[in-house]
């Protein structure tokens, strides 16, 4: 990527690459509910390991959606196996990143639903990129671009959801 100017191809590429993670993250929220992933475990600090916001159903649904998006990308690119692997790693990684973010928030004594700027927006990105990194090595400028795009997309989606009455807060 030419660091002097971010071109539209780079932006579209990183969005396309991250689609399994983006869709998994959204799907985990939409299809979530039920038993929490941490099974109600409370640590010595008196706080839950992760909390009620990360569930088995959301994790399974999000991982499945990430896999399906990866399969579609694999079909489009002519490499189904790469699509399966990257879709699975990006999708599951996104959900594990979100769970890790919840774990960190609990340790920082931040209750569920309370904001943790940057962590709330990028935890799933870090999880996805870490899990996929053994097979896909992205240049640092693409990683930075992914973070910037994700921040904009996340904020935009939250504002729209707030304006539509789907969220109580704009962030």
Swiss-Prot record:
Main subcellular localisation: membrane
GO molecular function, one term: CDP-2,3-bis-(O-geranylgeranyl)-sn-glycerol synthase activity
Name recorded for this polypeptide: CDP-archaeol synthase
Alphabetized UniProt keyword annotations: Cell membrane, Lipid biosynthesis, Lipid metabolism, Magnesium, Membrane, Phospholipid biosynthesis, Phospholipid metabolism, Transferase, Transmembrane, Transmembrane helix
Domain of life: Archaea
Biological pathway: Membrane lipid metabolism; glycerophospholipid metabolism
Naturally occurring in which organism (per UniProt): Methanothermobacter thermautotrophicus (strain ATCC 29096 / DSM 1053 / JCM 10044 / NBRC 100330 / Delta H) (Methanobacterium thermoautotrophicum)
Gene Ontology CC annotation, any one: plasma membrane
Lineage: Archaea, Methanobacteriati, Methanobacteriota, Methanomada group, Methanobacteria
Family: Belongs to the CDP-archaeol synthase family.
Family annotation (InterPro entries): CarS, CarS_archaea
Name of encoding gene: carS
């Amino acid at each position: 990527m030419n660091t002097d100017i971010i071109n539209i191809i780079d932006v579209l590429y990183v969005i396309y690459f991250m689609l399994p993670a983006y869709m998994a993250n959204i799907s985990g929220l939409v299809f979530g509910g039920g038993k929490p992933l941490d099974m109600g475990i409370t640590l010595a600090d008196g706080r839950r390991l992760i909390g009620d916001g990360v569930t088995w159903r959301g994790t399974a649904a999000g991982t499945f959606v990430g896999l399906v998006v990866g399969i579609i990308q694999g079909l489009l690119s002519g490499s189904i196996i790469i699509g399966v692997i990257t879709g699975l790693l990006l999708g599951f990684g996104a959900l594990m990143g979100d769970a890790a973010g919840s774990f960190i928030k609990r340790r920082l004594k931040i209750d569920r639903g309370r904001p943790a700027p940057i962590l709330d927006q990028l935890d799933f990105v870090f999880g996805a990129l870490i899990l996929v990194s053994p097979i896909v090595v992205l240049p640092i400028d693409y990683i930075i671009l992914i973070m910037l795009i994700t921040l904009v997309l996340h904020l935009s989606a939250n504002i729209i959801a707030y304006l539509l009455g789907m969220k109580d807060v704009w962030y």
